[in-house]
Each structure stands twice: as structure tokens, then as C-alpha cells.
Amino acid sequence: MNDAALAPDVSAALERGLQAQSLDAAFAAPLLRYLALLVRWNKTYNLTAVRDPREMVTRHLLDSLAMQPYIASGTLADLGTGPGLPGIPLAITRPQLQVTLVESNGKKARFMREALRHLELGNARVAESRAEALDEPAAYDHLTARALDTLAGIIAVGGHLLRPGGSLLAMKGVYPHEEIAALPAGWTVGEVHPLQVPGLEGERHLVVVRKG
């Protein structure tokens, strides 16, 4: 399947969402190419439980891009990225960002390598590894995690990757009061941003945790 094989309402939904998120319409083409590849591979390899391309636009692409305004340039490790979410959409829309896609599942890692080749995305690479086994201490300015664990759990497996003063950006649903209260020593919440994801009902928050 190429992006032309996606239904017109899929591309229209993405274009509306990009406009609502104040992102350049030119990003629609590479995002649709990524989406078409994900839809095709998902039929065989079960990369995501979301099967409908229109739903993927909202729950995968636009949800991932909701954190984009809060990420500066630099280096970013996306922990437990699955098929590349949010890392690949962020790499597409932030070409000055160097993204490492951390995923231990072999079929998901293979898919991401093919996606990076297909998209000619030179600012992203795949690390086929569990986050806790990745031997790159203090190598990253930012960590992201979209659906991995509690804040403390994310820090336990990936905190060593973040440089002092760096930030963990964790996507959450409702405001995570208990998770914030359980942060380990040396980690503090910088900001919590309520997010609006076009087409997605329910609360979404981006928790920015800083490493002391």
C-alpha cells in the first residue's frame, strides 16, 4: 500500500489535524507514507492494536505530535517506541532533532528500519534493545515515553540515558497526581501541559520531569 491507497478521508483528517496543531501542511506527505507502511505491515506483523487508518491518524499521529511544541532541538531517545510512536512523527516534523528509537521487539525494530529507509529519514536511528540495557549513559537531552510505564518506572529503566538537566517528556491521560508524588529523589516535575489532540476525546497531559 502506498499513501495514494489510503482513503481520501484519512489524508483529509491528517491535514485538518496538522492545521489545528499549527504544523506545516508539507508534513502530511511523509506522515501519510509512514502511515501507509504501518497499515501494510500491521496486517502481517500486528504492530499495533489500532487497525483503522482513520483511527491511526488520531490515536497515533496527532497524539504523538501533540508534544511537538515542547521539544527543543538536540538528542532524544524514545523509549518503548513500538512501531515508532511518537519518535518517527517527531523526527519528521523536527528535522533538527536527532531521534533514537528504542525498542526490543524484533519485528517492530525491523519495521522501523524499513520506515526510516522508505522515508529517507536521516535524523533517526533504531536501537534494538531494552532501555535498561542501552549503554549510552547521559547521551540524551530528552527522553520520551508514550505508553511505557509509570514515571518512576520509566526513570528506573531509562533514566541513565538522560544528561543532567535533561528532561523526560511522558504522555499521560488524566493528571497523574500519584505518579508525580512517587518520583525518585533527584527528579522534579518542571511542567504539566494539558494537551488537545484533534479528534481525541478524554484528558491528555504531557508531564515534563527534569533530572537534577
Swiss-Prot record:
<feature type="binding site">
    <location>
        <position position="80"/>
    </location>
    <ligand>
        <name>S-adenosyl-L-methionine</name>
    </ligand>
</feature>
<dbReference type="GO" id="GO:0005829">
    <property type="term" value="C:cytosol"/>
</dbReference>
<comment type="function">
    <text>Specifically methylates the N7 position of guanine in position 527 of 16S rRNA.</text>
</comment>
<keyword id="KW-0489">Methyltransferase</keyword>
<dbReference type="Pfam" id="PF02527">
    <property type="entry name" value="GidB"/>
</dbReference>
<feature type="binding site">
    <location>
        <position position="85"/>
    </location>
    <ligand>
        <name>S-adenosyl-L-methionine</name>
    </ligand>
</feature>
<dbReference type="InterPro" id="IPR003682">
    <property type="entry name" value="rRNA_ssu_MeTfrase_G"/>
</dbReference>
<comment type="similarity">
    <text>Belongs to the methyltransferase superfamily. RNA methyltransferase RsmG family.</text>
</comment>
<dbReference type="InterPro" id="IPR029063">
    <property type="entry name" value="SAM-dependent_MTases_sf"/>
</dbReference>
<keyword id="KW-0949">S-adenosyl-L-methionine</keyword>
<feature type="binding site">
    <location>
        <begin position="131"/>
        <end position="132"/>
    </location>
    <ligand>
        <name>S-adenosyl-L-methionine</name>
    </ligand>
</feature>
<keyword id="KW-0808">Transferase</keyword>
<keyword id="KW-0698">rRNA processing</keyword>
<keyword id="KW-0963">Cytoplasm</keyword>
<feature type="binding site">
    <location>
        <position position="146"/>
    </location>
    <ligand>
        <name>S-adenosyl-L-methionine</name>
    </ligand>
</feature>
<protein>
    <recommendedName>
        <fullName>Ribosomal RNA small subunit methyltransferase G</fullName>
        <ecNumber>2.1.1.170</ecNumber>
    </recommendedName>
</protein>
<dbReference type="GO" id="GO:0070043">
    <property type="term" value="F:rRNA (guanine-N7-)-methyltransferase activity"/>
</dbReference>
